[in-house]
């Protein structure tokens, strides 16, 4: 991860890309089809926390489109001229650590994600689901239910909501 991020930062410096440039591009992106409706519906029964391996500074344009659920992620180090100089990772397994912390203070967690780095939180969540995960990933974890649309994911959340203690 460090090598990849160092390479990306080097490319951004070489191409004189600033944080504003990147945020502008991200701001032009739309949420995935069904995501906004999913969030509106899920909030009727659940508190929503986004656990992400992104950075706050990159996520803010999309967070506004989601009505700002709680976001726990990493932080960029940005210089005076908005050049990205580095980053601070909260923890190498931040998603898993966050779920464990919520569990320790009495919360029961239901998690959804789309990649390998989400499987660590599925291990400690009460329930875990893949959403839009590539089959190359979901097929390696056949015990984790996998969904390709937000309506089915919403039904899965509703089906286990009474399991929470």
Task: Outline where the language-model segments fall.
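Alpha-helical substrate-recognition element adjacent to the catalytic core
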Residues: 1-75
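Alpha-helical segments flanking ligand/cofactor-binding loops in enzyme cores
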Residues: 36, 40, 100, 119-120
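Acidic, Mg2+-coordinating phosphoryl-transfer loop and its flanking beta/alpha structural elements
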Residues: 48, 52-53, 107-148
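Short, well-ordered alpha-helical microsegments
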Residues: 56-60, 118-119, 154
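Substrate-recognition "cap/lid" segment bordering the active-site pocket of phosphatases
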Residues: 57-109, 140
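Short, acidic/turn-prone active-site loops that include or flank metal/cofactor-
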Residues: 71-79, 133-137, 149-153
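Short amphipathic alpha-helix with an adjacent loop that forms part of the alpha/beta core around
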Residues: 154-164
């Amino acid at each position: 991860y460090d090598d990849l991020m160092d390479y990306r930062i080097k490319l951004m410096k070489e191409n004189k890309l600033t944080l504003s440039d990147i945020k502008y591009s991200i701001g032009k992106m739309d949420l995935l089809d069904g995501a906004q409706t999913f969030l509106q519906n899920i909030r009727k029964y659940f508190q929503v926390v986004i656990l992400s391996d992104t950075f706050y500074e990159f996520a803010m344009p999309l967070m506004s489109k989601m009505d700002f659920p709680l976001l726990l992620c990493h932080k960029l180090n940005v210089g005076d001229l908005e050049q990205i100089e580095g980053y601070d990772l909260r923890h190498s397994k931040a998603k898993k650590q966050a779920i464990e912390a919520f569990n320790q203070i009495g919360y029961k967690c239901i998690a959804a994600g789309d990649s390998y780095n989400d499987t660590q939180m599925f291990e400690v969540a009460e329930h875990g689901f893949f959403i839009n995960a590539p089959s190359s990933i979901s097929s390696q974890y056949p015990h984790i239910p996998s969904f390709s649309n937000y309506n089915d994911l919403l039904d899965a959340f509703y089906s286990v909501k009474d399991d929470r203690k």
